[in-house]
């Protein structure tokens, strides 16, 4: 069992809208996964929700705007802020500055690891299919 996960050894996934550097794969955990999100100026993932996941973000660097709910209520975020996204909550976060927005994202699976997507790669394949993104172009294994 692993207890320490160096952030210098991550798997990089470059989506069309953002980067996820996987630190702890859900396959290596019972109820969570951890990644570092990097958004360039103006970048934001699509508004989305997770039915089985509560998310916690810790803002490391940059400035951003968190959008919550169908009405997209806006909240500014900056380094040191902690964000909590309950399950089934529409959300997105956009880089609002001239420098990248970086934050640690912790996914907490309230009912345990999702059986249909037991690894981060399996989740990425589903996400790519939903968004019309090419999985092979998203996956970048080196930082």
Predicted regions and their residues:
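Residue-level recognition of conserved beta-strand positions in structured domain cores
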Residues: 36, 49, 60, 68-70, ...
């Amino acid at each position: 069992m692993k207890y320490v996960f160096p952030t210098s050894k991550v798997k990089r996934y470059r989506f069309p809208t953002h980067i996820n550097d996987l630190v702890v794969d859900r396959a290596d955990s019972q109820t969570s996964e951890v990644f570092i999100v990097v958004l360039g100026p103006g970048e934001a993932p699509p508004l989305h929700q997770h039915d089985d996941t509560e998310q916690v973000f810790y803002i490391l660097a940059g400035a951003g705007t968190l959008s919550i709910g169908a009405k997209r209520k806006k909240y500014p975020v900056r380094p040191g802020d902690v964000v909590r996204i309950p399950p089934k909550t529409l959300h997105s976060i956009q880089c609002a500055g001239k420098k990248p927005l970086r934050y640690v994202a912790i996914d907490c699976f309230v009912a345990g690891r999702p059986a249909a997507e037991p690894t981060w790669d399996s989740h990425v394949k589903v996400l790519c299919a939903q968004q019309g993104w090419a999985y092979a172009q998203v996956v970048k294994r080196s930082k």
